[in-house]
Amino acid sequence: MVQVENEYGSYGNDREYLRALKGFWDKSGLEVPLYTADGATPYMLEAGSIPGAAIGLDPGTNDKDFAEAERLARGVPVFCSELYPGWLTHWGEPWARVKTEEFLPDLRWLLENGKSFSLYMFHGGTNFGFTAGANFSDKYQPDVTSYDYDAPLDEAGRPTPKYAAIRDLLARFQPRGAKLPDLPEPLPVLTVPTVEFAETAPVFDHLPQPIRRPQPGPMESYGQSSGFILYRTKLWGRRSGKLVVTDLHDYATVFADGRYLGAIDRTKGETSLDIPKGEPALETLDILVEAMGRINYGPLLIDRKGITDRVTLNNMTLMGWEVYPLPMDEEFLGRLRFGRREPERPGNFFRGVFELHALGDTYLDLSGWKKGVVWVNGHNLGRYWEIGPQKRLFCPAPYLKFGRNEIVVFDLLVLRPAHVAGFADFE
């Protein structure tokens, strides 16, 4: 099956758009059933479903849910496209957990009533690199790097007690005499001794050629979709006072003449900080912005990153910007020049090495660091942040190698590197 859209009925009602998507798949030569997926409420199903496509319910766990969808079905199947054994987690919040005893009754109802279903998620996995998403309710809520999701298989693909409970329930609905297959042997895991970081590369020493614009502009206007971006301007007229970054997306560290002044955090609803008077008067303002994750559900899907509106200082609009896109991709990392030096200001890459004589999955502990991104042998493991709840990043065995391995940490806030060690477990 191929899904035409995902919960579109929650925030859109463009029938032509849905028909165009279905037409695309009809003409593609892919001869499989199509379906839509929406919440089990009348307006969502009416706006999100389309004739000729099966209807998926997110979730569908009772007669009322299915009756509402079948009213619109016009002869196509109805099924539960997302049954939630777990849930996602945002930075700064407790781990989202769904108790097994709360989830199993819904699964049992679907089985007893002969309904088709899909578990979301059966195996959660990881938001590697910059792929983590975000939500927005009353505030911006970026997702943590882990997409473990409290799923039946954990982030490393290992069965959990929740998996065992689901397996036991499914076994009761097997044909007489049928036997579930044995579980495979667990994948190897390993620990990594403490890694020291002896080399540093300041991000401000590795800026590309600037792009000059009157106003800052979102990173998409510079051909960039993720990572970081630096905005620099000369201060004329106003040189101190209240700095306001209108519509910041998503996290900024602010510097004046190279001195760190503080951070502005979209998750807290922050838009400003105070710039003190300097002696002599301050001349250069730097705003380094991190794109933390795009909103992927609801009416705010257009989530441009960087500085998406103007910047003011005591109500004076600051003009004349130099913009430095910092995608922090493979090409960018390949140009870093590491050396043994003490950083003068926050915003630095730190490099360490370690040796391995065996391979396996591991979890790298970043609890001593502040906020940033980690690469292992060039593979971007994702973001970490001291506010938690996630403190360890999953590193799968294929990212590691026998012999020498390299870790690069980019931290927005620390001047002195902490340590990193690998553990066999998530917590």
State the predicted function of each range.
Residues 264-270, 382-393:
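Aromatic-rich membrane-interfacial microdomains
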Residues 225-234, 344-357, 393:
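Short beta-strands within extracellular/lumenal beta-sheet-rich domains
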Residues 1-13, 172, 176, 343, ...:
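Mature extracytoplasmic enzyme cores
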Residues 169, 272-284, 349-350, 355-357, ...:
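Short, surface-exposed tryptophan/glycine-enriched loops
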Residues 291-292, 300, 370-386, 401-427:
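C-terminal functional regions that serve as terminal interaction/effector modules
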Residues 1-119:
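Substrate-binding/catalytic cleft of secreted carbohydrate-active enzymes
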Residues 3, 14-18, 22, 30-31, ...:
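Carbohydrate-binding surfaces of carbohydrate-active enzymes
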Residues 241-255, 354-377, 384-385, 407-410:
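Aromatic-lined ligand-binding clefts that engage carbohydrates, nucleic acids, or primary amines
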